[in-house]
């Protein structure tokens, strides 16, 4: 049975100390539990941020593309040109076609080989408008015409460095022209030139079937100028 007797002051005081000690211990344990909960919350939040960062990086990596650039240097002249990769969407069919005809025309007009001169001469005439064709034919009637100047002992080789279609029927072609002795003796002489060409298609003129095979689109140069590139020795 419970003791019905009241507690003495000393007993009451001792009991208060015991209850206070129990309350302090409970409070301490509660604070520790709260602190541990906060620590775990921060840890999980940091882990979530790290995971999201890794996912973002993994998602973005395929979007990063390294485009290689190859610098090609012409051995004889030292001319440098950039060779790059390109996607088909970077160029329209019209641009590619214009560049094709521009480079074909310039190469045929600027090179010289005694054994193929007639072929190049006829090809340049075919791809030239009347005024340009007349000027070209006249150049072969002059005393310093290429066939008289070089004869069979010299060749002029052409290497295209770049071709730019500026739109509205105008383009520029940059090229290296190298002069060599036909027998391979002697040092080669190279120089860099820029041809500025105006052109058009489907001009109303009569072409034979053989000519149409060589020039199916009726490409015709309406203006032609070639200049030595500035800054050469």
Swiss-Prot record:
State the annotated membrane topology for this chain. Single-pass membrane protein
Q: Which coarse location class describes where this protein primarily resides? A: membrane
GO cellular component labels: plasma membrane
Write down a Pfam family by its short name: VirB8
GO BP field: protein secretion by the type IV secretion system
What SUPFAM superfamilies does the record point to? NTF2-like
Spell out the family assignment given in the record's similarity comment: Belongs to the virB8 family.
Name assigned to this protein: Type IV secretion system protein PtlE homolog
Q: Which organism is it from?
A: Bordetella bronchiseptica (strain ATCC BAA-588 / NCTC 13252 / RB50)
Which gene carries the instructions for this protein? Answer: ptlE
